[in-house]
Amino acid sequence: MRVWELGQARLMVAGAFGNLAVHHHAAVQVGVGLAGPLSVTADDDAHHTCRLVVVASGKRHAVQSDSRSEALSIYLGPHTWQGIALRTLSRTRGVWIVGNGERLADATAAALAVGGPRAAADFLVGELCGMSSADPDGRGWVHPQLRQAIDLVSSSAPSRIDLASVAGAVALSPDYLGRLCKQQTGVSFSATTRWVRLLTALRYLADGMPVTDAAHLAGFTDGSHANRVCWEMAGAAPSDLARALKDSPLPSHPAP
């Protein structure tokens, strides 16, 4: 498994994903089967086979690939205009099986091979967002103070993060910020902070740090706390993610 930071609240993960439990997270996820199909399970026990899927933030799901076929997942911040646009397109059922996904999946694989992770993500997310009427500047979609609050949470990890202090920093009441977060992103403020911590831990794991140390540095109270959040939001144990990163034939690195 390889991980790339793409900037603008985007993260890309590549590898073979199997045996994932149904889970949910604060990001909007775009899953691509680069050379073969994906198996998608939703919380209503619906099963789909496809090459390209978009999962709304907060939707319980599991996206898996054949062990011999590499898949790609792009995670978009729920407060970004791309995240909002794709969540809107997938909002009806929470899981959007993209029509004509084979064409876009093949084109994404080609973009990855030629231009690298950032080029592949820019191409695919741009194509998908082109199907939405969302404003590229995000105006009218995300409350500016909510965007500011989520950016603050992301930049504050692994320090202590609580709703009251973040609300005060963006001049909103805690109750209003909590409601706004749920209304506009589909996930609670606390789920957003747990997701940020998990991503922080994943970055440490990608650097080869032991699970316990990564959990501590990411701000989890202890190993069991990190384990619960990892199962909740990734569908696997931290040790499984660490093993997948270690066994990758290519090291994780920032996207070019």
Enumerate the predicted regions with their spans:
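Amphipathic alpha-helical segments enriched in hydrophobic/aromatic residues interleaved with Lys/Arg
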Residues: T80-Q145, A149-D151
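Short, Lys/Arg-enriched anionic-surface-contact patches
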Residues: S132-Q145, R179, T185-V196
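Short, charged, intrinsically disordered terminal tails
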Residues: A85-R87, S132-D137, E232, D240-A255
